[in-house]
Amino acid sequence: ICEQVGEQPVKGIFPRKVVRVVTPGTVTEPGLLPGDANNYLASVILDTTTAVNSNPITASVSYVDITTGEFAVTELPLEALRAELTRLHPAEIIHPDSQVLPDGITGHITALPAWKFEPGKCSEVLISHFKASTLAGFGLKDNSLSARAAGAIVQYLKETQPDALNLLTSLRAYSLNEFMTLDASTRRNLELDETLRGERKGSLLGTLDFSVTPMGKRLMHQWVSQPLLHVAKITQRQNGVQYFVENGMVRAELRATLKPLADLERLVNRVLAGQAQPRDLVAMRATLTELPKIKEVISGQKAVVSDQWSVCTQELSLLQNAIDDDPPATLQNTGVIRPGYSSELDGVIDASKHARDWIANLEGVEREKTGIKTLKVGYNKVFGYYIEISRGAADKAPESYIRKQTLVNAERFITPEMKEYETLVLNAEERIKEIETRLFREVCAELVKAANQILATARAIAELDVLSALGEAAALGGYTRPEVHEGSGLEIHEGRHPVVEQLLKSDRYIPNDVIFEKGEVVRVITGPNMSGKSTYLRQTALIVLMAQMGSFVPAASAKIGLVDRIFTRIGAQDEIHAGQSTFMVEMVEAANILHHATPRSLLILDEIGRGTSTYDGLSIAWGIIEYIHNHPQLRAKTLFATHYHELTQLADLLPGIRNYNVAVSEADNKVVFLHKIIAGGADRSYGIHVGQLAGLPAPVIQRATEIMAELEKTSGRAVKIDPNAAQQVALFPETNPLLDELKELDVNSLSPIEALNKLFEWR
């Protein structure tokens, strides 16, 4: 952004200079920012010092939101980089131009000279910025990969938004081990913050987010994106939610009080960055005014939120005394400071008003004093204020009048006293602007001193907003408090899908249980199309996620052992830009799951193998289930929905596999899907019935029914097991009765008629 500087020259154009560089990650204007989400600038660097075969295995990510002051850094395996960036969804990513970011990382990417990520320089920048002697106090080692990522951000801000550096008062080093891991595929498949169509409504966030403040909405997004892995922290959040569930009147009163609050977090940071305008302080004052009421509403409830935050009495008093109730939008206009705050300013304003009144009354006073009826007072830009008398009466002008201009029909005069008042009037507005600007800056300077205190208050308000919002969601949705523990069990009674049940306005949602018994590893779920298998899988994952973010869950009851990762393989999607088919995408995601899942993970696998031929798909699905069950370092709790009914045979072979299916009612040639998960395997998918429901023409349905009957008569369904094959199961019949009979037949002894009869018999 270039602005005019200096005075307008006699010739030529105004001199200009670059006053600011704007990039996607350094925007601060409220109109350009998403109110309910952070605007992150991320820095990414790969660790080439520990590369294997020239391939880095470690990376560091640092991110900052200069509108809130959030500044953090972590080191992570390269394979987790995409998932972390997906969670952050940064507006801009900077990285060294000497490195190539892994595939799949998209967005606004800015490559910077590699020297800006140099270890010594970056550490020095951080130490200098935080006025520290070492980075150990921030949990970092000098010259470490994390220091390079964070230091590069500080250097970038120096070039683009130097005022924003005041906002960076701390740096938080975090570990991925603090939060549940959710890769990009899982976030998409579970529709955490947006649906597959890119809409917020219909997502988990859209269902749970009853928050009413901008700070609360950003924090809610973080909680949904980062479920916790510490039972104590989860319990603390649950305590807060429970309080608001049980105290509906308090919840309603608090939410009504919070609703009109401004974005205190971003207002403070605009003050810190020197970008605050008068109406920003009015909004801050209105918000601070509500703090005593908020604190009174939750008085004594330490289980809800810490009571260490301040009601900012001094800051509120300052804003009430200093800033006018209805100031102009910018400091370019007067009326910012409240009358009575500054005697100096009041004196100038009074003098200006007195001068204007004196000049306004001057014409009548002078006419009466001189008796000249044609006397009048005027103004122009050349001479300023003047007294004009007609030529015929000019000789009656008092001696105190000083002739200034002679016209054809009049003479113009000034007086010393008039010029004094003129100076007061003409200079007063600029003088008022000057004083108001100085006073405004002084008020902002006092707020800067209290910035940390106000920001702590903003964070407390955000947490209150989220807890009360989750309480609202729980009360409206009939959610219950889950028991989250350090064990490995998973027990959900009458679980429901939190989003789908809200969309089923007229129909009652059918709840289902998920109870993994001791030793149970994989649930193979078969059943008709459109019967609810995929919904059942997703609701299980969402209930676990909600429990670990601290929310209540849509279930009659739930006991959930900590889950470190949720993996999903759901749906068919081509990665055309990467040259990958539907089946290749499916296999890549399945491989990722098998390589990175742990015994504490939850695997949601829907229709694995359907992207290829039946035999290939069945073989792969079979092998995957065996691998999950048998691998000693895997054995993750798995829900495996499939149309391959042959997979139900695995329950007879492997002790940790159970069969379940979706109940169907058949009567009078009608099929009704009951949406209830029951024990046992299904032997039909009712695909033709679904086609009929979808409106396929009757001849198509009739012909499909005939073909299905023929196929069922001729297909071999038996699965034979070799008990000595170390679980390498033969999926299909090893011999065919027809082939055996053909081998035993002596074709040389058959007559032509006998041969034709045999063919007719085998038809």
Task: Please describe what each predicted stretch is.
Residues 1-17, 460-468, 475, 641:
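Amphipathic alpha-helical
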Residues 143, 212, 223, 390-422, ...:
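ATPase nucleotide-binding head domains, primarily ABC-like/P-loop NTPase cores
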Residues 357-377, 478-480, 497, 505:
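Flexible, glycine/threonine-enriched loop-and-boundary segments that flank and lead into catalytic domains
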Residues 407, 411-445:
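Extended, charged coiled-coil "arm/hinge" scaffolds of SMC/Rad50-like chromosome-maintenance ATPases
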Residues 1-243, 252, 256-259, 263-272, ...:
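Charged catalytic and DNA/RNA-contacting regions of genome-maintenance
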Residues 273, 277, 287-290, 339-340, ...:
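Charged, surface-exposed helical/loop "interaction arms" that form contiguous linear patches used
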Residues 735-763:
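C-terminal tails and terminal domains of large nucleic-acid-associated
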